[in-house]
């Protein structure tokens, strides 16, 4: 069974198109109006070992908020669809990733109970067109829509770029590991996820 998804989400504010294949490492194409966000999405999708296309159009370009939120929603929905009934997935994963002085822990459970707990000390208010207040919001929107319980904690660091990038790398690696097929069972005492 192919584990991929093609999701389009259009509102009065944005149009987001996401193609995601979680089992095939291939080309990654990302186009949003926020340069640093493009860099982080490419990082996330690369460390997920995926093939992906993300295209985001901001119809009402007030600021970066709508793009960040709507890409997170659409990407979350794509992961959820690609996983189907989640039969056989490892389900849990955690990663502790350094980037120079920054050290970030990501722990997740593909539980179908989407929520995020994010503890990052981001000193800069903006980086590459992205308001750093939208970083936790990205993770929250992604977690809610993907059905992933997500914890992200900064263990050390002071460089905003390094902290954010370590977070996206760790999330990508954790998602890759948690979505691997390890058997043919649903990993839950309930029998469903």
Swiss-Prot record:
<comment type="pathway">
    <text>Amino-acid biosynthesis; L-histidine biosynthesis; L-histidine from 5-phospho-alpha-D-ribose 1-diphosphate: step 6/9.</text>
</comment>
<dbReference type="GO" id="GO:0005737">
    <property type="term" value="C:cytoplasm"/>
</dbReference>
<dbReference type="InterPro" id="IPR000807">
    <property type="entry name" value="ImidazoleglycerolP_deHydtase"/>
</dbReference>
<keyword id="KW-0028">Amino-acid biosynthesis</keyword>
<dbReference type="GO" id="GO:0000105">
    <property type="term" value="P:L-histidine biosynthetic process"/>
</dbReference>
<dbReference type="InterPro" id="IPR020565">
    <property type="entry name" value="ImidazoleglycerP_deHydtase_CS"/>
</dbReference>
<dbReference type="Pfam" id="PF00475">
    <property type="entry name" value="IGPD"/>
</dbReference>
<protein>
    <recommendedName>
        <fullName>Imidazoleglycerol-phosphate dehydratase</fullName>
        <ecNumber>4.2.1.19</ecNumber>
    </recommendedName>
</protein>
<dbReference type="InterPro" id="IPR020568">
    <property type="entry name" value="Ribosomal_Su5_D2-typ_SF"/>
</dbReference>
<keyword id="KW-0368">Histidine biosynthesis</keyword>
<keyword id="KW-0456">Lyase</keyword>
<dbReference type="GO" id="GO:0004424">
    <property type="term" value="F:imidazoleglycerol-phosphate dehydratase activity"/>
</dbReference>
<comment type="similarity">
    <text>Belongs to the imidazoleglycerol-phosphate dehydratase family.</text>
</comment>
<dbReference type="InterPro" id="IPR038494">
    <property type="entry name" value="IGPD_sf"/>
</dbReference>
<keyword id="KW-0963">Cytoplasm</keyword>
